[in-house]
């Protein structure tokens, strides 16, 4: 149990890579704040399944990365539980598939807001707690899209 007695915050953990990270951290004994935009029945079922299987604590945190006020509120809710944050995994992202010349500036700004600025803001708030506790690791999840140049994903 590599992460026993560790507390992690994971964004975007309802599907894909984030879901796998959530499962891996759970399997290794971490207490996890599972951050998602929407807590639906499928996500609740996943959390129940993981906590039964691995006997760890998973606390769902719902907020929209488009809203800085909601980001701050989510961080306050996390910190209110007085669990020092050992690990922050920024995984949440959005993608828009269209050729570059057909992608509006508004859409580009929206993607950058979620994929970069909101994650940076979230990290700044969590980092204050890590500095106070004199410990913590921050992981930013990325994809290979920047390297392989997938057609229609230049905004991503």
Where are these regions (language model features)?
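Substrate-binding pocket helix/loop in short-chain dehydrogenase/reductase
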Residues: 99-100, 107-112
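Conserved glycine-rich Rossmann-like NAD(P)H-binding loop of the short-chain dehydrogenase/reductase
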Residues: 28-45
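A short, exposed helix-loop element centered on a Lys and neighboring polar residues
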Residues: 123-124
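Conserved glycine-rich cofactor-binding loop
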Residues: 7, 14-15
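Active-site loop-to-helix junction immediately N-terminal to the catalytic Tyr of the SDR YXXXK motif
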Residues: 103, 149-156
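Conserved NAD(P)H cofactor-binding loop of Rossmann-fold oxidoreductase domains
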Residues: 91-96
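Residue(s) in the substrate-gating loop at a strand-loop-helix junction
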Residues: 143
């Amino acid at each position: 149990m590599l992460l026993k007695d560790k507390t992690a915050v994971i964004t975007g953990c309802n599907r894909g890579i984030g879901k796998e990270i959530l499962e891996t951290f759970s399997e290794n004994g971490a207490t996890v704040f599972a951050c998602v935009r929407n807590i639906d029945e499928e996500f609740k079922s996943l959390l129940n399944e993981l906590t039964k299987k691995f006997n760890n604590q998973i606390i769902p945190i719902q907020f929209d990365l488009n809203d800085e006020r909601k980001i701050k509120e989510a961080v306050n809710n996390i910190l209110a539980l007085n669990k020092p944050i050992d690990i922050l995994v920024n995984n949440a992202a959005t993608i828009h598939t269209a050729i570059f010349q057909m992608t509006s500036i508004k859409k580009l700004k929206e993607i950058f807001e979620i994929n970069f600025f909101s994650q940076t803001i979230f990290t700044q708030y969590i980092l204050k707690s890590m500095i106070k506790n004199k410990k913590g690791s921050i992981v930013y999840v990325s994809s290979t899209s920047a390297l392989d140049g997938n057609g229609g994903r230049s905004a991503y």
